């Protein structure tokens, strides 16, 4: 496998409970490096743009409202097979179905407030990373 980069968001439910450090520890324990990170508050426009792929889905407005409800931590992660590895560390979207020890099993409050987002494919990561980070903000 090759070294990849992936994108992560620590969502408002997790930042509100001061879980950034605990989530970062799980990321690093999995062998992924955090090569860019910043804590921000998304505007409605940013959230709508980022989640635009879901615009026609019934949950879109609730998702946007949730994502602007508090600070988030956006990150670029790097490592061997980073996309698949981070998806394993995150666990299933529904925390009730997530494996023990995953971020969502340990920290998520619900399927909506599931603590983290991660890119699902190289193409997605290639779009999501520059949405929040310029090249000079990523320190490999």
From Swiss-Prot:
Keywords: ATP-binding, Cytoplasm, Kinase, Magnesium, Metal-binding, Nucleotide metabolism, Nucleotide-binding, Phosphoprotein, Transferase. The keyword ATP-binding applies. The keyword Hydrolase does not apply. One of its GO terms (cellular component) is cytoplasm. Its main location: cytoplasm. One of its GO terms (molecular function) is nucleoside diphosphate kinase activity. InterPro entries: NDK-like_dom, NDK-like_dom_sf, Nucleoside_diP_kinase, Nucleoside_diP_kinase_AS. GO terms for biological process: CTP biosynthetic process; GTP biosynthetic process; UTP biosynthetic process. Homotetramer. This is Nucleoside diphosphate kinase. It comes from Maricaulis maris (strain MCS10). The gene is ndk.
